[in-house]
Amino acid sequence: LGTDIISPPVCGNELLEVGEECDCGFPRNCRDPCCDATTCKLHSWVECESGECCGQCKFTSAGNECRPARSECDIAESCTGQSADCPMDDFHRNGQPCLNNFGYCYNGNCPILYHQCYALFGSNVYEAEDSCFERNQKGDDDGYCRKENGEKIPCAPEDVKCGRLYCKDNSPGPNDSCKTFNSNEDDHKEMVLPGTKCADGKVCSNGHCVDVASAY
């Protein structure tokens, strides 16, 4: 019967092997302050080696910010002093008003039509007039609210702001007052994002404009 020959671990070869907690090379070359290069074990005082809340082999002090808030709907996370990891990402409750009541919080963001138009087309592009969104009642390539089994479902009159996204191009020269985004890869980009404010006290949910209190 053949047998596998397993070489004994060699401390100092910069390979983490069985029985070693670390291996940073020979003592004169070691650049890892957490590792005892003579034993290939972590120093007894080491609390961590890496992580957003780890510095110089110790847990970062409690209260040090490790993940800044990305919007007014997000919550900044701080180290606990007991772990090398930043706490799980948390955010303000869905439906909380944001951006001076222009929107409502949704999963840490504040989705509004203007920001969606800007993200797709850049500067000088804004939310289109209400008349453009009326096209979403047609239920065709130009305008619809959602897809069911590949079929484009028209919007009810009260849901038109929750279908296809329409933007207004204010660039100099001839421009499109009912500009839409066309994507062969991701038709979700063509649509108003979930959680977007569609009327006072209402947000978009699955192609419907519903009361914010019942949406979440």
Swiss-Prot record:
PROSITE patterns per UniProt: DISINTEGRIN_1, DISINTEGRIN_2
InterPro entries on file: ADAM_Cys-rich, Disintegrin_CS, Disintegrin_dom, Disintegrin_dom_sf
GO terms (BP aspect): blood coagulation; proteolysis
Residues of this chain annotated as glycosylated in UniProt: N175
Pfam hit, one: ADAM_CR
Listed EC numbers: 3.4.24.-
Cofactor details (free text): Binds 1 zinc ion per subunit.
Keyword Calcium: yes
Gene Ontology MF terms in the entry: metal ion binding; metallopeptidase activity; toxin activity
Disulfide bond positions: C11-C40, C22-C35, C24-C30, C34-C57, C48-C54, C53-C79, C66-C86, C73-C105, C98-C110, C117-C167, C132-C178, C145-C155, C162-C204, C198-C209
Tissue-by-tissue expression: Expressed by the venom gland.
UniProt family annotation: Belongs to the venom metalloproteinase (M12B) family. P-III subfamily. P-IIIa sub-subfamily.
Subunit organization: Monomer.
Function (record text): Zinc protease from snake venom that induces hemorrhage.
UniProt-recorded name of the protein: Snake venom metalloproteinase HT-1
Lineage: Eukaryota, Metazoa, Chordata, Craniata, Vertebrata
